């Protein structure tokens, strides 16, 4: 049986960064390098119905080992890594028996310090895997892949552990918001599933943001600066006025918990035309409606002031809070909580201040909460994971499978 850490290190050595500018699926051909390896590993584990489609979605099924009906459940992770930092030539460091000191990340000059990352102080005695300070690690979400496959290997090696059908799925392009777009829920054939894509040990999430993209387009008039008086309209000045109308404290860096925000994420600026790219987030549908109305109101106010419709607002919904689709199936959450408790883990139920494949899948008819991986600081060079936490994730996956069978006997 492949060791959990060995699997993980193998996966992070493969660059699978996704590309939001590419329209195809997967957005980068290199995601197939990991996808094809996972197909081989699923076949080595002798799973049934192993497949990969033209879009890079990998699926397989561990058949039930009991002689009574048990609902099929699934475990899902994504193969791509975030565009925010390089995923090429990842060089992990293993820190055994961490003692609370500063961790030097290779020769990059970067460090993991308890003062900046206080979670480290809760991990004394743990074995950590870090980056070398030049790339992300890829624990998001290759740790989830390693944990799922290791759990499957445990179930295969221990046939005395009862379980129903276990469906496994690995998706491309989650980091650019498309991971569930072409996921074949009918083919997957699970009653419900769990993404293994969370952070610290104990995390259990079934609420996420409602998400909208807001593009503000400001139109100006470009004239030679030497003859511009009374003629030029600088669209960048209009854009600046609009941004100043946004609530200064309702930003990602100023909010937490269930608080929503407006986030100016990008800007393409010129005198004649400036485009502001916002993402807007709120946990309630009502709150999101109010945020959309607020932005439209500010556009209207600015247009009235400018005496011409120089500002446009284009709103596009991205995903919705899965809570409304998961709560009607309380057993899905209760099973995960029961499994964690049986593994001496205190469930830490909190909202996801983001989105997951599970959010989209829940609205596609597959209730799909999110479970921890044991990782921290995703999407950047300070990403790290605890080997202890990874092993606990494996234990929880195995226990969910076991309890699902025993509870339905």
From Swiss-Prot:
Cofactor(s) it depends on: Zn(2+)
Annotated binding of Zn(2+) 1, by residue: 78, 140, 197
Domain of life: Bacteria
Binding site residues for Zn(2+) 2: 140, 175, 379
Cleavable signal peptide: none
Subcellular location: Cytoplasm
Cofactor info, note text: Binds 2 Zn(2+) ions per subunit.
Example GO biological process: proteolysis
Record's keyword annotation contains Ligase: no
The entry's keywords: Aminopeptidase, Cytoplasm, Hydrolase, Metal-binding, Metalloprotease, Protease, Zinc
Class of this enzyme: hydrolase
GO CC term (a single one): cytosol
GO molecular function: metallopeptidase activity; tripeptide aminopeptidase activity; zinc ion binding
Residue ranges of coiled coil: none
Active site: 80, 174 (proton acceptor)
E.C. designation(s): 3.4.11.4
One Pfam family in the UniProt entry: Peptidase_M20
Catalytic activities: Release of the N-terminal residue from a tripeptide
Similarity remark: Belongs to the peptidase M20B family.
Its biological purpose: Cleaves the N-terminal amino acid of tripeptides.
HAMAP family on file: Aminopeptidase_M20 (MF_00550)
The protein's name: Peptidase T
Species of provenance: Aliivibrio fischeri (strain ATCC 700601 / ES114)
């Amino acid at each position: 049986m492949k060791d959990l850490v060995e699997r993980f290190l193998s996966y992070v050595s493969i660059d699978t960064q996704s590309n939001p500018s590419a329209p195809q699926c997967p957005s980068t051909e290199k995601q197939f390098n990991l996808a094809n390896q996972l197909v081989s590993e699923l076949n080595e584990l002798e799973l049934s119905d192993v497949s990969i489609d033209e879009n890079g979605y990998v699926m397989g099924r561990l058949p039930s080992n009991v002689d009574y009906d048990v609902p099929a459940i699934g475990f899902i992770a994504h193969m791509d890594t975030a565009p925010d930092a390089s995923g090429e030539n990842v060089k992990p460091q293993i820190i055994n028996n961490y003692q609370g000191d500063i961790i030097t990340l290779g020769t990059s000059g970067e460090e993991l310090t308890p003062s900046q990352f206080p979670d480290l102080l809760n991990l004394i005695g743990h074995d950590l895997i870090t980056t070398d300070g030049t790339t992300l690690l890829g624990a998001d979400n290759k740790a989830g892949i390693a944990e799922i496959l290791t759990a499957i290997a445990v179930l295969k090696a221990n046939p005395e552990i009862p379980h129903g059908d276990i469906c496994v799925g690995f998706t491309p392009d989650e980091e650019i918001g498309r991971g569930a777009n072409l996921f074949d829920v009918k083919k997957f054939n699970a009653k419900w599933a769990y993404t293994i894509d969370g952070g610290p040990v104990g995390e259990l999430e079934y609420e996420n943001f409602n998400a909208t993209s807001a593009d503000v387009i400001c139109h100006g008039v470009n004239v030679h600066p030497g003859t511009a008086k009374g003629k030029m309209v600088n669209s960048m000045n209009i854009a600046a006025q609009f941004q100043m109308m946004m609530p200064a404290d309702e930003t990602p860096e100023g909010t937490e918990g269930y608080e929503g925000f407006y986030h100016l994420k990008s800007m393409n600026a010129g005198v004649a035309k400036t485009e502001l790219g916002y993402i807007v987030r709120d946990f309630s549908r009502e709150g999101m409606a109010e945020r959309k109305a607020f932005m439209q109101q500010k556009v209207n106010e600015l247009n009235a002031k400018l005496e011409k419709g120089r500002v446009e607002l284009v709103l596009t919904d991205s995903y919705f809070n899965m809570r409304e689709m998961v709560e009607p199936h309380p057993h899905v959450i209760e099973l995960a909580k029961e499994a964690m408790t049986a593994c001496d883990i205190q469930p830490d139920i909190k909202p996801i201040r983001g989105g997951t494949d599970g959010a989209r899948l829940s609205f596609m008819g597959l209730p799909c909460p999110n479970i921890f991986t044991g990782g921290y600081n995703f999407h950047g060079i300070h990403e790290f994971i605890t080997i202890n936490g990874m092993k606990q994730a494996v234990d929880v996956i195995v226990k969910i499978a076991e309890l699902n069978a025993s509870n339905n006997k």
